[in-house]
Amino acid sequence: MDVNPTLLFLKVPAQNAISTTFPYTGDPPYSHGTGTGYTMDTVNRTHQYSEKGKWTTNTETGAPQLNPIDGPLPEDNEPSGYAQTDCVLEAMAFLEESHPGIFENSCLETMEVVQQTRVDKLTQGRQTYDWTLNRNQPAATALANTIEVFRSNGLTANESGRLIDFLKDVMESMDKEEMEITTHFQRKRRVRDNMTKKMVTQRTIGKKKQRVNKRSYLIRALTLNTMTKDAERGKLKRRAIATPGMQIRGFVYFVETLARSICEKLEQSGLPVGGNEKKAKLANVVRKMMTNSQDTELSFTITGDNTKWNENQNPRMFLAMITYITKNQPEWFRNILSIAPIMFSNKMARLGKGYMFESKRMKLRTQIPAEMLASIDLKYFNESTRKKIEKIRPLLIDGTASLSPGMMMGMFNMLSTVLGVSILNLGQKKYTKTTYWWDGLQSSDDFALIVNAPNHEGIQAGVDRFYRTCKLVGINMSKKKSYINRTGTFEFTSFFYRYGFVANFSMELPSFGVSGINESADMSIGVTVIKNNMINNDLGPATAQMALQLFIKDYRYTYRCHRGDTQIQTRRSFELKKLWEQTRSKAGLLVSDGGPNLYNIRNLHIPEVCLKWELMDEDYQGRLCNPLNPFVSHKEIESVNNAVVMPAHGPAKSMEYDAVATTHSWIPKRNRSILNTSQRGILEDEQMYQKCCNLFEKFFPSSSYRRPVGISSMVEAMVSRARIDARVDFESGRIKKEEFAEIMKICSTIEELRRQK
């Protein structure tokens, strides 16, 4: 039978059908190959938007830099980065006037954070540009490498463990005439394999010392590595994103802390809150505007889109904002906050891996690294690439491009939101001094603008004034992509508002399904996602019940754990059938052991082990929750774990789920193929680092170490802790005299070894 799809929607209000138009089912597009082309696009576009600025040369690195600030007044419709300093400062002043004490209070809050933050704050985050190896690394490894190099170059302030002291080292490192770094390299040699008697290539990993002069070091310290943004839906072209190195990260963190503190106090800011809290905040602003537009006034809302937000922002503008926000604050505080924007106005963009060439005729492939783009003959490239390279050449130094204007994606979300809100703030009647007025919402580059006026001409005048005011601070509202509606219907950060927020359920679709962590976590995450969507996203009971059944089915296929009495044959069915037959209480078996599903929409909040505990055979309980089971590498039991779920839009969200550690909570082992690559040395460092941290945590359960006091090494701290614990255990009779003596002896030996070293 043919179903006419429009019939499905006859009973559905139009706004509820919005989510069916979203491109959110199926796999998102991923990028392949190098991001070099996208990065060159970004660099070239950014310079084009600011082309009428002044060119200067950085005296330290020799990099050419373009400064568009206070450039020509912008022209209509063309995006441009010519922000006017005095306008930005005035917007800040008015923002402060409307919110007395806001900057002062935020500065005090931030000052406290600055003095207390530990350097391990920087280990959060994923890939980070590691300047010592000139490539991306996990954040913790990149930080460890940086600190190691700092210490071997006599920079030791970081040993206090405070982030601010690590940043002192960063500042000092920039004054050094040269830095000595350790890099990894690999040697290949051909040897005969004893077993097979064939020749094989053996790789050995070495570490070598290398000296870097001041200019090269500065270039590395100011470099942002670039990658292609993956999994972006609804776009034809990919785009580049940046990952900064450890020198920049700490400074950015403090600036964003200050800006976050300000955003929390601004009712128009869509950051840093999210989810339902954000919806409530938005609904308030809308309510205010609709209440005030009595019968005499019209109210219209623009669903706004800004053209190339990041590429028209300017670090110099952020410096002006910070200078204003921190006026009257202590000198050290103002200095530390102004370093991030200064580093960004001298930033370099690393062009990535370069280009791959292949000759079909000769079956040859070769990679042209980014470093060669400055000198290679352009006849090998197609026309569009040739144009890109010609344009970028004057900016190239050692495979990186000088990129003074522009901000790169996602670096100063909070601070740029403050700038956006400061323009929304100017819409009050006391500032517009006429019959129209505006208010709105801002979240990074996304905005919604609500304009009220007595008639249509007034609305038009209000929108024009807003548009022109934005231009003065380097914000370019796109006239093509923004649209206006009677207030009551608009979209903001993928929330659809129609006299209240409409659940956009399709956004959550990608997070339904089996995550692939392990049997225990996957079951827990799966039901938690369904529970959360019932709470937040209008997932009705019938649909939720269906989602649950589909999830269980998916789960059973993933882990091949069909019910013990099923006819389906899989690799596991022999074992599971045997278990099923010898189990008295079959309802007590977990789904992953071939048991029945006892979940329904009323008990989704209970972990499966707890749900079935009373129903389990005793010996099954013993096997399931046995910390001595040799096949399980147990993590310590945390009652709540965090899973990363992928909503369709925006970054991966962290979602809490209840974790009960059982024999199903295994941790998969690392892929072995990494052991044969140049990453091996890094992997060994990482494991070493991990082992030390694990050992340290064994001595200090998380409740007892918050902020280390004084400067003692990890080893000293552990030895003294071991002595104290041993004495307590001995005196309370928990350990024998011989054991106590042995512990004391080991402690003395460790101290002796440290002294000899």
Swiss-Prot record:
Gene Ontology MF term list: nucleotide binding; RNA binding; RNA-directed RNA polymerase activity
Catalytic activity, EC: 2.7.7.48
Reaction it catalyzes: RNA(n) + a ribonucleoside 5'-triphosphate = RNA(n+1) + diphosphate
Enzyme class: transferase
Region (Promoter-binding site): 249-256
GO biological process terms, semicolon-separated: DNA-templated transcription; symbiont-mediated suppression of host gene expression; symbiont-mediated suppression of host mRNA transcription via inhibition of RNA polymerase II activity; viral RNA genome replication; viral transcription
Region (Disordered): 50-82
Function: RNA-dependent RNA polymerase which is responsible for replication and transcription of virus RNA segments. The transcription of viral mRNAs occurs by a unique mechanism called cap-snatching. 5' methylated caps of cellular mRNAs are cleaved after 10-13 nucleotides by PA. In turn, these short capped RNAs are used as primers by PB1 for transcription of viral mRNAs. During virus replication, PB1 initiates RNA synthesis and copy vRNA into complementary RNA (cRNA) which in turn serves as a template for the production of more vRNAs.
Protein name, per record: RNA-directed RNA polymerase catalytic subunit
The gene coding this protein: PB1
